[in-house]
């Protein structure tokens, strides 16, 4: 048959149409009761959380590649509002906050993205990711049916979605984003506040759906997630979780691979056998997406850590704080992922047939026309079991699952760890520091930069969280006839504070310190102080250690000295100083002088050599050092210091607080049995955090290190180490 030009043109157009339709089909994300469907295909999705601001852009490619090599399909991240909009309408998407770059790197690696926009994140992040300025918007009430909050939240959410669309990053545009999350763990808050919470849930769902991303929206810990939005599970175990509709897939957005470290707390860890067991149990009971929170935890640089959170956000993740594989956790989970993928055709084609193999043992068998997979489970915490399945014996350790991708061959058991353990060491680099020091004087009531008020003021309303530090200053005049001057029985100063730490200076000398903790952020300082006849200078340095990241009514949270403040033991009994006239000052002097940078004020004289201050409060230290050879990750050993902050070449590597020793019960930990954050602990009696990550990408050939020490420490004990 001979085709004329018109026939050929019609065929060519038909082919183009088919190709176009094919592209449309391929660029699609939907779901059914079994799984997320990408490009028309159901998928078992293995995911890991990597938060872009908690590492450096130079680290991102390596982290993403290791995640891919570890068997992951998806990278999950929050979006950090306070990092992106530090002032109203002023946006920042550079350096560690270059969200677009991060997502494009994930795409280049061939992985997908679950973008948890929130924009509330919790995440042990300062103020839960909210910008502090939001607290002071008139009429503001957080995360409820409140117009000022909804307007701000909608504006930022739209900003992020439009940015993703402009860069063509949603899967329907050919990008990697296959899921997006609105809000975050809101169910408990909704339950607590009632009707306004329910109204807010409906509003936020409709707002998100109206943005037309082309990919499914999810809400975690949200049993009443409306309509097409998928409700998902967070926790150590989610095997028994069920979504609120039989038409939605069973998804796990946070499988906690460990837990956070707070100052004053021991360091938690979670045995990999238990993580693998939890994943296998979830998959055998119909789960189709598992996300490890965290896969790489990273570092809380700057002042981004939440209330009392350590600068390290290592989380006992498969990739440690420095980006190195944690073994055997990384490799044992990699083997799990391979076994699950071998079973994927059967898992997604059929529902499980469950058969008892013993009192606490059972088989989950998935049949399809072309495949069969079985999960053999032993729920017994104490005893191993030999079971018969299809006429063959299988040995199941306690609290374990064996995976048989062909219903015959055991390729993996969650408790049989074949990967070798690797112990990481912190090895001194031999770097020598030659310290200079500068001691701050305590401010006085009438000096420059102070302002006065009658009574006590709340700290964050004054600082707007631009500094951790806020001074409360007053004078106490003691008459010569006061009895305590003769008896030597000094009066008792009592200061009640909403947190987090308080340094009390009397006549320029540190009289004492008090601090709270994560479970009890409020504090009371109560100590006898030495006063003389005449005017005595009282300076209270109130210190915030991050802002709370979880709870309700963010707009009502307070910090600082709110009183009462009393002096007991004077002739007239007790003085209530709470309503006295107080002077206030935001920040410490060194911050105002930018001592952490190379552009410091020339008016500062640094003490050198043998005159360098040791064990003195309010002391700044600086030195220079050369970058060590090699490519091993670097850290500072700060074990001889007390509390403060550290800068490298003007960049803040986080708060240090080695003086706060870890409380808790450390000892042997059995993987078997239900895990919680207190079960497996290390570091008891030692500093909650000793080593502080120094990113190599922040270094030059010669570098400046600056330390601000609040309590007093010995800088000669600081050393630069490499992680090997």
UniProtKB/Swiss-Prot annotation:
Signal peptide positions on this chain: 1-27
Q: What residues make up the catalytic site?
A: 185 (proton donor), 254 (nucleophile)
Q: Which residues are glycosylated?
A: 255
* Keyword entries, A-Z: Apoplast, Glycoprotein, Glycosidase, Hydrolase, Secreted, Signal
Name the domain of life. Answer: Eukaryota
Q: Does the keyword Disulfide bond apply?
A: no
Q: Known catalysed reaction(s)?
A: Hydrolysis of terminal non-reducing beta-D-galactose residues in beta-D-galactosides
User: What GO molecular function terms would the record report?
Assistant: beta-galactosidase activity
Q: Where in the cell is it found?
A: Secreted, Extracellular space, Apoplast
EC number(s) recorded for this UniProt protein: 3.2.1.23
Q: What is its main location?
A: secreted
SUPFAM superfamilies, per this entry? (Trans)glycosidases, Galactose-binding domain-like
Task: Identify the PANTHER family for this entry.
Answer: BETA-GALACTOSIDASE RELATED
Q: What is this protein called?
A: Beta-galactosidase 4
What species does this protein belong to?
Arabidopsis thaliana (Mouse-ear cress)
Which classification does the entry list for the species?
Eukaryota, Viridiplantae, Streptophyta, Embryophyta, Tracheophyta
């Amino acid at each position: 048959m001979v085709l004329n030009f018109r026939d050929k043109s019609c065929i060519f157009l038909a082919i183009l149409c088919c190709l176009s339709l094919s592209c449309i089909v391929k660029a699609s994300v939907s779901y059914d009761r079994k799984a997320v469907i990408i490009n028309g295909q159901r998928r078992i999705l293995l995911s890991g959380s990597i938060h872009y601001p908690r590492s450096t852009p130079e680290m991102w490619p390596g982290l993403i590649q290791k995640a891919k090599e570890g068997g992951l399909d998806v990278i999950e991240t929050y979006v950090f509002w306070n990092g992106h909009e530090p002032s109203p309408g002023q946006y920042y998407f550079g350096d560690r906050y270059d969200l677009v770059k991060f997502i494009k790197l994930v795409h280049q690696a061939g992985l997908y993205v679950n973008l948890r926009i929130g924009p509330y994140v919790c995440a042990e992040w300062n103020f839960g990711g909210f910008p502090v300025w939001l607290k002071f918007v008139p009429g503001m009430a957080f995360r409820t049916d409140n117009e000022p909050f909804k307007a701000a939240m909608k504006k930022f959410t739209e900003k992020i979605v439009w940015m993703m669309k402009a860069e063509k990053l949603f899967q329907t545009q050919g990008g990697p984003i296959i899921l997006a999350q609105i809000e975050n763990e809101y169910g408990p808050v909704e339950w607590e506040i009632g009707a306004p919470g329910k109204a807010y849930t409906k509003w936020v769902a409709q707002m998100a759906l109206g943005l037309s991303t082309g990919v499914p929206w999810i809400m975690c810990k949200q049993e009443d997630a409306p309509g097409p939005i998928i409700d998902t599970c967070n926790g150590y175990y989610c095997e028994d979780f069920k979504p609120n509709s039989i038409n939605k897939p069973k998804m796990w957005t946070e499988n906690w691979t460990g837990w956070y470290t707070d100052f004053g707390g021991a360091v938690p860890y979670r045995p990999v056998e238990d993580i693998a067991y939890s994943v296998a149990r979830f998959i055998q009971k119909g789960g189709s997406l598992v996300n490890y929170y965290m896969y790489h935890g990273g570092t809380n640089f700057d002042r981004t850590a939440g209330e009392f959170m350590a600068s390290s956000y290592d989380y006992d993740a498969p990739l440690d704080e420095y980006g190195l594989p944690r073994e055997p956790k990384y490799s044992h989970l990699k083997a799990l992922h391979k076994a699950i993928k071998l079973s994927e055709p059967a898992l997604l084609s059929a529902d499980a047939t469950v058969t008892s193999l013993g009192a606490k043992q059972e088989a989950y068998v998935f049949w399809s026309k072309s495949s069969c997979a079985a999960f053999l489970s032993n729920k017994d915490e104490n005893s191993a079991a030999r079971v018969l399945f299809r006429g063959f014996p299988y040995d199941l350790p306690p609290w374990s699952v064996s995976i048989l991708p062909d219903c015959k061959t055991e390729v993996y058991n969650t408790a049989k760890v074949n990967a070798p353990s690797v112990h990481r060491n912190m090895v001194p680099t031999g770097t020598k520091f030659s310290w200079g020091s500068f001691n701050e004087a305590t401010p006085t009531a009438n000096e420059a930069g102070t302002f006065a008020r009658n009574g006590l003021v709340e700290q964050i309303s004054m600082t707007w969280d631009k500094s951790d530090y806020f001074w409360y200053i007053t004078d106490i005049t003691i008459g010569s006839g006061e009895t305590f001057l003769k008896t030597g029985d000094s009066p008792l100063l009592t200061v009640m504070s909403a947190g987090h730490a308080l340094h009390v200076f009397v006549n320029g000398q540190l009289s004492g310190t008090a601090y709270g903790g994560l479970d009890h952020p409020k504090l009371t300082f109560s100590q006898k102080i030495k006063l003389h006849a005449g005017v005595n200078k009282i300076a209270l340095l109130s210190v915030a250690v991050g802002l709370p990241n979880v709870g309700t009514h963010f707009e009502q949270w307070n910090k600082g000295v709110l009183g009462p403040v009393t002096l007991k033991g004077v002739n007239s009994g007790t003085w209530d100083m709470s309503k006295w006239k107080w002077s206030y000052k935001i920040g410490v002097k060194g911050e105002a002088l930018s001592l952490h940078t190379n552009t410091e004020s020339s008016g500062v004289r640094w003490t050198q050599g043998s005159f360098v201050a040791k064990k003195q409060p309010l002391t700044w230290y600086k030195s220079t050092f050369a970058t060590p050879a090699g490519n091993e990750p670097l850290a500072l050993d700060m074990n001889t210091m007390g509390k403060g902050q550290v800068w490298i070449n003007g960049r803040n590597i986080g708060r240090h607080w080695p003086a706060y020793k870890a409380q808790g019960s450390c000892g042997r930990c059995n993987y078997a049995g239900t895990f919680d954050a207190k079960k497996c602990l290390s570091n008891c009696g030692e500093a909650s955090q000793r080593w502080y990550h120094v990113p190599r990408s922040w270094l030059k050939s010669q570098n400046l290190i600056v330390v601000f020490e609040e309590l007093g420490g010995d800088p000669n004990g600081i050393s630069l180490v490499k992680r090997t």
